[in-house]
């Protein structure tokens, strides 16, 4: 096998596919990248029996062939090469890389032992790539890190008509984002549970300014994503995800609206002097919200901001990290807190003006911390 390709093109493709290499592979060959050269193009792929990544790049192919190369070292080599065409050759078990005056020789890995790459399922529809990336950032903050509850370490994706919904929860907060789905078949409904790492990778590396194609599993356990020359597949997670939609209250008689940046900065400042996870108290009254943390001999801090309150005065407390996580992913100038009463979760949504309707495409439900009685 022999081909020549620009350094930047090769480095980008190798770097992207190498991101999917397993940390603890069940077999040494899974540390490798499968490189296939054919007429005018080169395919670079990784697979760990659960997640596959594949990118096709244009190249000047002099001799077709297939080889398996240690992935991480190849990625490091490609990043270090000078900005010039790279000549890549593979002969039996020896791989040679030449770029200007730089020469590398690596031992190849046995291609025969590498698992067969899964095919991308049939495309079911598309979403706007940038919108999907934003949605992933907004919901992944609520993904659980508790490996004893594996279902909650995933992100649920639901398809209904022309709407895609992403959901995640760690039992203390819940994030839900709806985006426009462009289906091939508008009658198809689906609900799948994906590894959060897979969804995060798709959001950060496949979702550019164009469309992201998604292949839902008509049968079996494989979902696929495609954008440009990149393809990735992943097996689904098993189990029944809890019906977390039911946790959103139907009616919320109390609403408070605060400027997002002001509240985020105040929460950050007050958290500086509060002990770890000391609750932030928010006391909403007509025209203002008083924020404070700490009591008695503890370090204390407080700040008062302008707020628009509809309904009765209310005092609540939240885990400062959970509140800050939510505020960071809102792209609106204002956030709205919707309450039933103080002991119940609040629904946080965004809006562009203090007296406007809220944008319910993204909602962040946050459990309160119980306040002391004295």
PLM region spans:
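Structural preference for solvent-exposed beta-strand-turn elements
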Residues: 1-374
């Amino acid at each position: 096998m022999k081909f020549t390709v620009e350094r930047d093109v090769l480095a980008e493709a190798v770097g992207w596919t190498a991101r999917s290499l397993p940390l603890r592979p069940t077999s040494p060959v899974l540390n490798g990248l499968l490189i296939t050269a054919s007429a005018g193009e080169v395919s670079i792929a990784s697979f760990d029996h659960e997640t596959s990544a594949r990118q096709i790049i244009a190249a000047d192919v002099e001799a077709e062939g297939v080889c398996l190369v240690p992935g991480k070292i190849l990625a490091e080599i490609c990043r270090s090469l000078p900005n010039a065409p790279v000549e890549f050759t593979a002969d039996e078990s020896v791989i040679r890389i030449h770029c200007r005056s730089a020469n590398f020789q690596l031992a190849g890995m046995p291609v025969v032992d590498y698992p067969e790459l899964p095919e991308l399922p049939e495309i079911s529809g598309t979403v706007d790539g940038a919108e999907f990336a934003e949605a992933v950032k907004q919901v992944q903050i609520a993904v659980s890190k508790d490996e004893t509850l594996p279902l909650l370490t995933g992100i649920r994706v639901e398809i209904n008509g022309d709407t895609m919904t992403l959901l995640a929860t760690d039992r203390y907060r819940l994030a839900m984002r709806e985006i426009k789905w462009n289906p091939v078949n508008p009658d198809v409904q689906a609900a799948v549970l994906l590894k959060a790492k897979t969804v995060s990778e798709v959001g950060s590396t496949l979702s550019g300014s164009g469309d992201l194609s998604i292949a839902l599993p008509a049968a079996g356990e494989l979902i696929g994503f495609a954008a440009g020359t990149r393809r990735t597949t992943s097996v689904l997670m098993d189990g029944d995800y809890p019906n977390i939609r039911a946790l959103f209250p139907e009616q919320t008689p109390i609403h408070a609206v605060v400027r997002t940046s002001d509240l985020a900065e105040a929460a950050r400042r007050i958290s500086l002097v509060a002990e770890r996870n000391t609750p932030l108290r928010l006391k909403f009254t007509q025209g203002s919200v008083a924020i404070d943390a700490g009591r008695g001999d503890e370090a204390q801090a407080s700040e008062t901001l302008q707020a628009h309150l509809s309904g009765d005065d209310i005092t609540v407390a939240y885990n400062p990290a959970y509140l800050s996580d939510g505020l960071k992913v809102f792209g609106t100038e204002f956030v709205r807190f919707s309450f039933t009463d103080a002991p119940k979760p609040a629904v946080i949504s965004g809006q562009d003006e203090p007296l406007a309707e809220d944008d319910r495409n993204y909602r962040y439900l946050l459990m309160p911390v119980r306040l002391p009685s004295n």
